[in-house]
Amino acid sequence: MQAVARKFDVAGRDERNRSLGKAGEERVLHHERAILASAGRQDLARKVRWVSQEDGDGAGYDISSFSPEGEERLIEVKTTNGWERTPFHISRNELAVADSNRDSWTLFRLWNFSREPRAFELRPPLNTH
């Protein structure tokens, strides 16, 4: 067997992943606002925040939203172009925030994003999924 050398653009891959993640977060932000507005909760829709863009990474979630009943939702968005079981990275901080906010934290999983986006949500504890 012979090894084949090839160049791998790590910076390009990282930029594509960041762009994909940002697009997924933006889609979830609009989705959350639309759900609240359609439930007659424009007051809450106006309070939905894109935390990772406004405050930066490190909060352990990307979107701060609400249920139509007014309960807090802390949403971590994970987006891939592959199928629903495509691996994705979740940080120790995200896992810790999920564990300490089990009632409000949710992972919003977007997959097949560039073709026909699909989604599902996972709630803590994540090790059961």
Feature roles, as predicted:
Residues 1-41:
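A short mid-domain helix/strand-loop element embedded in enzyme catalytic domains
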Residues 39, 46-47, 69, 74, ...:
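Active/binding-pocket-proximal capping segment
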Residues 9, 56, 64, 124-129:
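Poly-acidic low-complexity segments
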Residues 58-60, 70-72, 85, 102-105:
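Active-site lining segments that contact anionic ligands and/or coordinate catalytic metals
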Residues 77-128:
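Catalytic cores of nucleic-acid endonucleases
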Residues 35-66:
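A short acidic/basic microdomain associated with nuclease active sites
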